[in-house]
Amino acid sequence: MFIMRLFSSTSLILLLSFGSLLADQIYISPDKNIQERFQETLILAKPGDEIILAAGIYEFTDGLSLDVDDIKLSGAGHDKTILSFTNQITGAQGLLVTSDNVILKDFAIEDTKGDAIKVKGSNGIYFINIRTEWTGGPKSTNGAYGLYPVESKNVLIDGCIAIGASDAGIYVGQSENIIVRNSRAEYNVAGIEIENSNNADVYNNLTTHNTGGILIFDLPDLPKQGGHTIRVFDNQSIQNDTPNFAPEGNIVGEVPRGTGIIVMASENVEIFNNEIGNNATVNLAVVAGEDSDDPNYQKFPKRIQIHNNQFGPVGFDPDERGALGPILVEIASENIPDIMWDGILPFWQYLLGQPADEKLVIDSNGDATFINLDAFWYVVLPYFHQPETDIDVFSGNISPLPAVQLVFPD
């Protein structure tokens, strides 16, 4: 038995070593045949290969796809290696990745017809120093998403830039074990969006000049629901002032211009040590999701902790878009506060009270102001409506959430 185990272990080591010896470095430079040559390289690559893109502008007319595990695709820098899709005719995105343990590093994708980089069903996807951009500025005809991992695990987005997406610059959906850090999102409808996902850390990012800076959403009618355990910390969500340019019918089309952070229908979210200010409508909002026929959808946010944030000017030019804007302006009038909760609860909780472990906790945010819109009673009994503005009512002990653990690439 010992000999068999030794033989098996030795065979595995030799196999891994042999596999690494077979791995290639494949060098690509731009030329007139780059569409066919690059796609062929992506198809024929072997696990362990590194595809290295030289500096230059690569022009494509069709989308690209990668379905090989353990691949590193790297350029010379997001300002030097540029994959341009300005003349794209076909393809739903610039690059589609459907494999595991893929590193995308040091290049840019510009002006795709649809999403810039979509990743689906990957376990181990690492975006490092990637830029996605629609260079013509904010337009509803821009692609929806810049960086777009969905239905994936172990997602790292580090040092990236996302500009001009008509939905979200950086979007992670229906995924788990996520880190978004050291990145910049600007001139998108949503800068960073974590949707229907769990175990996410969003930190040390700058979201500015978007319609809304950071969105933590849970939506109905999706295979994965119940987004939870998300930390948003050490970010700047400032001066988000771009008018909403989402195509009609998109959920983010409801986001008012000038929103810092929104949490909708998620649970176990901790927001701390952020700088949130110069947002014309609201700095931080916690709201329920919309009614849905989906029996699995839980639309009420739970266990949201907001602490140790620094707030700046707010509400100086509110946008009355969607369901949030008009009611906020009408109730708060000219005194729009830093933190807004719509106050919507399951009906039985209005009668019996909210469980302690589901309550909103707001603590140690300096001179931050607050309003509970108490929107249900505003609609049902408007003449007796009394919004709550005492922030101390929501103070309490903070229960820190655990850090996300990923295995990082070399």
What is the role of each PLM region?
Residues 3-14:
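Sec-dependent signal peptide recognition
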Residues 18-19:
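N-terminal signal peptide c-region/cleavage motif recognized by signal peptidases
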Residues 24-36, 50, 70-114, 136:
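Right-handed parallel beta-helix/beta-spiral solenoid domain characteristic of secreted/periplasmic
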Residues 35-39, 61, 85-95, 111-118, ...:
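Extracellular beta-strand/beta-solenoid scaffold signature
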Residues 36-44, 59-68, 73, 84, ...:
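Short, T/G/N/S-enriched strand-turn elements that build extracellular solenoid repeat scaffolds
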Residues 76-79, 100-111, 123-136, 153-166, ...:
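Right-handed parallel beta-helix
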Residues 299-410:
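Acidic, glycine- and Ser/Thr-rich low-complexity intrinsically disordered tracts
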